[in-house]
UniProtKB/Swiss-Prot annotation:
This is Endoplasmic reticulum-resident calcium binding protein. Residues 1-26 form the signal peptide. Disulfide bonds: none annotated. InterPro entries: EF-hand-dom_pair, EF_Hand_1_Ca_BS, EF_hand_dom. SUPFAM superfamilies: EF-hand (SSF47473). Residues 313-343 are annotated as: Disordered. GO terms for biological process: intracellular protein transport. Ca(2+) 1 binds at residues 72, 74, 76, 78, 83. Ca(2+) 3 binds at residues 148, 150, 152, 154, 159. Residues 313-331 have a biased composition (Acidic residues). Calcium-binding protein. Required for schizont to ring transition. Required for the breakdown of the parasitophorous vacuole membrane during egress. Required for the proteolytic maturation of apical membrane antigen 1 (AMA-1) during egress. Required for the proteolytic maturation of subtilisin-like protease 1 (SUB1) during egress. Required for the proteolytic maturation of plasmepsin X (PMX) during egress. It holds the Pfam family EF-hand_5.
């Protein structure tokens, strides 16, 4: 995950343009649509729900009921739009903090609590050839210098947060947008035509140009006003849309699709519990699975059955390896037992 985030956030121009499109439109469709696929768990049995949430139906419903009381700040047994928005802000902040901490843990190789330019370069260079690293080195340096607010040559956790979310810093936001335009706006008229987009559009992993049909589909996604051009405002609207942030809750979609436009009362919430369980309201189930990670007092973190199985397999493999190592050691010991004066 760390490498993907770095590539999306620190590479510039077409790479950012492409990866953001993939995240919003194809890679995580379920994360921007609350009622797709298995989001509705109400038709599943105990074992199926446990596979998804690590809890059987009654256990999941109990946590979802407790969640209602956390969101219902005034304890009137009804969740208002304002309370949903407050909950959404809390989720976004918690998810963002966890993301920043994870990035820090991966990149901060000397574990001093800061990220140096060398550490950032090393992390960025993983799995990239020298030519790609050199190509993006200047852009990486620019970003480092912009977010290094106290100019001490290293990034604190708050400064890394700016690097991960350019929307939080106007100078970095402007840099991202200008680089997208610089790459795609061939004739430098301040907007991107379809022909320019096709000419400069390529697959980020192979460098192969996309076919015209796919390029048109991608272009139309950004061309919000359908005037045949992508301008700066449209880039901002899509690339920096708060609705696409991790933890963002589409309040209207939740109210209409799950609660059918009705007031979100305590009884209705519990009635819809298994439809709520893996939507944006719960960070797609993570709040129910891992409440301690969100500092929520609704239960202990679970271990999903699949993760437990993998852990057992790893333990078995480790045990096998230990036995093999022991056998090899015994063989070696038999081949040459040291004399007393060699010890």
């Amino acid at each position: 995950m760390m490498k993907i985030n770095l590539y999306k956030l620190l590479c510039f121009i077409c790479v950012i343009f492409l990866l953001h499109k993939n995240v919003v439109r194809s890679g995580d469709n379920m994360k921007y649509n609350d009622m797709k696929g298995l989001d509705d768990l109400s038709k599943l049995n105990d074992d199926q729900v446990k596979d998804i949430l690590g809890l059987k139906i009654d256990g999941a419903k109990e946590r979802i009921e407790k969640l209602f009381h956390l969101i219902d700040k005034n304890n009137d047994k009804e969740i208002t739009e304002e309370e949903l928005n407050t909950w959404s802000s809390f989720l976004k902040n918690e998810i963002f903090l966890k993301q920043v901490q994870a990035e820090m843990g991966q990149i901060d190789s000397d574990k001093d609590g800061f990220i140096s330019l060398n550490e950032l370069n090393d992390a960025f260079a993983q799995n990239l050839d020298a030519k790609e690293v050199e190509k993006h080195s200047e852009g990486l340096l620019k970003r480092f210098q912009i977010v290094d607010k106290d100019k001490d040559g290293k990034l604190s956790i708050n400064e890394v947060g700016l690097l991960i979310d350019p929307m939080k810093d106007e100078e970095l936001k402007e840099l991202e947008i200008n680089e997208i335009l610089e790459h795609h706006d061939v004739n430098k008229d301040g907007k991107i035509s379809l022909d320019e987009f096709k000419q400069t559009r390529s697959d980020e992993s192979s460098g192969v140009k996309k076919d015209d049909e796919m390029a048109l589909d991608d272009f139309n996604f950004f061309d919000a006003n359908k005037d045949g051009f992508i301008d700066k405002e449209e880039i901002i609207k899509v690339y920096f849309d708060p609705a696409h942030e991790s933890g963002a809750i589409n309040v209207n979609e939740i109210k209409e699709n799950i609660f059918e436009g009705k007031k979100i009362t305590y009884d209705l919430w519990n009635e819809k519990a298994l439809k709520i369980a893996v939507t944006s309201l719960t960070d797609y189930g993570d709040v129910i699975r891992y409440p301690e990670d969100f500092k929520l007092d609704i239960g202990k973190n679970v271990i999903l059955p699949t993760a437990r199985s993998r852990a057992f397999e790893d333990d078995d493999m480790d045990a096998d390896n230990t036995e093999d190592d022991k056998d090899e050691a015994d063989d070696a010991s038999q081949q040459k037992s040291p004399a007393i004066d060699e010890l």
